[in-house]
Amino acid sequence: MAYLRSSFVFFLLAFVTYTYAATIEVRNNCPYTVWAASTPIGGGRRLDRGQTWVINAPRGTKMARIWGRTNCNFDGAGRGSCQTGDCGGVLQCTGWGKPPNTLAEYALDQFSNLDFWDISLVDGFNIPMTFAPTNPSGGKCHAIHCTANINGECPGSLRVPGGCNNPCTTFGGQQYCCTQGPCGPTDLSRFFKQRCPDAYSYPQDDPTSTFTCPSGSTNYRVVFCPNGVTSPNFPLEMPASDEEAK
């Protein structure tokens, strides 16, 4: 009987190990509430200051993104709106957020047995962020940051309530969005790159903005407002509603 129990426990551990490639811990250190969003897994979660949310990411997860929504107000059914990062007026996101929103992007257990991950400002900026492996191993497997006061310094042409849009969102076209083939940085994309050199500043900013870790070697952590206190130019929360993420 003991053998059967131990075999069953081993099976469960092996199943969990096989199923989940990594856990992603999302933490809010901002002095205001952030409504975290995660697709294609996770959905959404309200995070008051100091709260965390752990997402179990399966092997093969790709095109995944995590972002923070600000100035949200949801009813008990999880319907409402957010000033930045809104995903169709629902708490539990199934699609991408409306710019501007700082993105943590990742794909797990991809070619060459690597996890690929980055911070992207291609959808603009709303909240400072770090994205880090919990077990860094050197090379391109280390913490990355975007913690500059981009909202406070945002060019007037890109400034919107609660954030700073990327020029691709604002102006569109090949020059800013690389819609018809290769393109390079512009003066406006350099504004983002100079302040957050780890992050994507335009769609083809790959060489300095993509990071990798050996698959299965580490979990990951995303922190909103890693320095704890943000500039007054960052948004303050709206009055809390009665909703709570399930």
Curated annotation (Swiss-Prot):
- InterPro entries attached here? Osmotin/thaumatin-like_sf (IPR037176), Thaumatin (IPR001938), Thaumatin_CS (IPR017949)
Q: What induces it?
A: By abscisic acid (ABA), salt, salicylic acid, wounding, and fungal infection.
Q: Which PROSITE patterns match?
A: THAUMATIN_1, THAUMATIN_2
Signal peptide stretch: 1-21
What keywords does the record list, in alphabetical order? Disulfide bond, Signal, Stress response
Disulphide linkage map = 30-225, 72-82, 87-93, 141-213, 146-196, 154-164, 168-177, 178-183
Supply the Pfam families for this chain.
Thaumatin (PF00314)
Do you know which PANTHER family this protein is assigned to?
OS03G0233200 PROTEIN
Family statement:
Belongs to the thaumatin family.
What this protein is called in its record is Osmotin-like protein OSML13
